[in-house]
Amino acid sequence: MKTKFIFVTGGVVSSIGKGLAAASLGALLESRGLRVTHQKLDPYINVDPGTMSPFQHGEVFVTDDGAETDLDLGHYERYTSARLSKKSNFTTGQVYFSVIEKERRGDYLGGTVQVIPHITDEIKSKIIENAKGSDIAIIEIGGTVGDIESLPFLEAIRQFKADRGAANVLYLHVTLVPFIKTADELKTKPTQHSVKELREIGIQPDILICRCEQDLPRDMKAKIALFCNVEEKAVITSQDAEHIYAVPLALHREGLDEQVVEKLNIWTKAPDLAPWQQVVEKLMNPSHGKVRIAIVGKYVNLTESYKSLSEALTHGGIANDCRVHLTYLDSEKIEQEGIDGLLEDVDGILVPGGFGERGTEGKIKTIEFARTRKIPFFGICLGMQMAVVEYARNVCGLEDAFSSEFKPDCLNPVIHLMEEQKGVSRKGGTMRLGAYPCTLTKGSFAQKAYGTLDISERHRHRYEFNNKNRTVLVENGLVLSGVYKEGDLVEIVEITDHPWFVGCQFHPEFKSKPLNPHPLFKAFIAAALQNKKA
């Protein structure tokens, strides 16, 4: 089958849910037996989001091949079976970088390099390259129609219909139909203007997904269809859902996937949505009540910084048939004001990754609380490193133990810079990134969770466990239960005389899915549930 291309644009406001719409459509088409891939095109000039503040960009999602990408790729991987790569996300910065390199090599034979055709051709070539081997390629354009930064991308996808044939290209526009409380009615004018602007660029949307607080009445769908030049059945309501994993089912009820396969002239089997129905049922009606998990981090004022993490915890709840209630606590506040009263009622504590010294002592206090009070604990990346620091200080008696990242001259740097990172001065794309193998210790918490001895997980770090302190930590009871054998790098630490205490250097949240929860999150929530019952 010749690859079909679906381009997803957004209008009226940012953060309208294009990523979730694209991911949900991918899930629906995959349930029909189609091979789906995803791609996100970001209009900013940064080469990638790896050096951007979490407060500006939210989470950086890491792929198996080490790409630092937009958090929407996390949605795509969670909703489908796709394993995305460096080709799945590119930016204006990458496009211009590539074109300028070609110009310097003389690839354009002395011609004047312009946005059209050179930039648009580069964009199209990257889209085509990523789509190879798939039946459907769903490409989301970042930003909002009308943004000046998006224009080269929109021009490139406009040309796609002429290049690939109208039967192989579909334009899907996600827009807002706001409810005005004072008038007590939904308003279609923002959608009309958004589509008008898109049509002025030369793109006529085939399907509209209308985000709204309440159901769109039929007469309003007819009005939108008339003024936006689409079929009435192609006006899809996307009402605010109680949970994001209910969105694929809601869009299916609206006929989204049926419209897509009809307009692209694809024959498919009937969709099998039973797995999604089971997920939603467990979310809405859990058998075991709820568990309370505290996430103690430094980016808690923007929870999008922990998007994959919060979703992975939800997946752990699905696996244990319970609801997970998350409480976000600022580690810097704990550092300044103490821990009293903040963690008394939680069933489990998670300390996530991060960069910089701010809030680290608050994380260490939190870890000590979890260790001494026997509360199930999960430390990820920096959370694992601070667990090692806490153990070294309070159990091994190494009072000045710390990470050389924060105190280069400390006498006991139990965490230190990786050998291959020494001398690296450039920030972008230079960390230990992507998937690496890890060998587990038989009988450990981690091995019991995975059910195997050999695993592969994704990383994003420069600092590691310092093997010079290995003996003293092990002699005092710290279990090094996961090791990257090639570099003798400690990946997982545990405490055995504890209900569940695990720290890992990698980011397991990047591989968790609602239909296939990650083993460590499944085990962590199970321990928290057991702690609640106790």
Swiss-Prot record:
Identify the coding gene: pyrG
Which interval of the chain is the signal sequence? Answer: none
- Identify the enzyme class: ligase
Query: What is the protein name for this chain?
Result: CTP synthase
Would you tell me the Gene Ontology cellular component terms? cytosol
Residues at the active site = C381, H507, E509
Any one GO BP annotation for this protein: 'de novo' CTP biosynthetic process
Q: Where is this region: Amidoligase domain?
A: 1-266
* Residues that, per the record, bind ATP: S15, I16, G17, K18, G19, L20, D72
What positions does the entry give for Mg(2+) binding? D72, E140
Q: Which Pfam families does its entry note?
A: CTP_synth_N, GATase
Q: Where is L-glutamine bound in this sequence?
A: G354, L382, G383, M384, Q385, E405, R462
Q: Which reaction does it catalyse?
A: UTP + L-glutamine + ATP + H2O = CTP + L-glutamate + ADP + phosphate + 2 H(+); L-glutamine + H2O = L-glutamate + NH4(+); UTP + NH4(+) + ATP = CTP + ADP + phosphate + 2 H(+)
Q: SUPFAM superfamilies, from UniProt?
A: Class I glutamine amidotransferase-like, P-loop containing nucleoside triphosphate hydrolases
Q: Output the superkingdom of the source species.
A: Bacteria
Among its keywords, does the record have Metal-binding?
A: yes
More details: CTPSs have evolved a hybrid strategy for distinguishing between UTP and CTP. The overlapping regions of the product feedback inhibitory and substrate sites recognize a common feature in both compounds, the triphosphate moiety. To differentiate isosteric substrate and product pyrimidine rings, an additional pocket far from the expected kinase/ligase catalytic site, specifically recognizes the cytosine and ribose portions of the product inhibitor.
Documented activity regulation: Allosterically activated by GTP, when glutamine is the substrate; GTP has no effect on the reaction when ammonia is the substrate. The allosteric effector GTP functions by stabilizing the protein conformation that binds the tetrahedral intermediate(s) formed during glutamine hydrolysis. Inhibited by the product CTP, via allosteric rather than competitive inhibition.
The protein's GO terms of the molecular function aspect are: ATP binding; CTP synthase activity; glutaminase activity; identical protein binding; metal ion binding
UniProt-listed Enzyme Commission number(s): 6.3.4.2
**Which parts of the sequence belong to the Glutamine amidotransferase type-1 domain?**
292-534
Keyword annotations for this protein, in alphabetical order, are: ATP-binding, Glutamine amidotransferase, Ligase, Magnesium, Metal-binding, Nucleotide-binding, Pyrimidine biosynthesis
What family does the database annotate?
Belongs to the CTP synthase family.
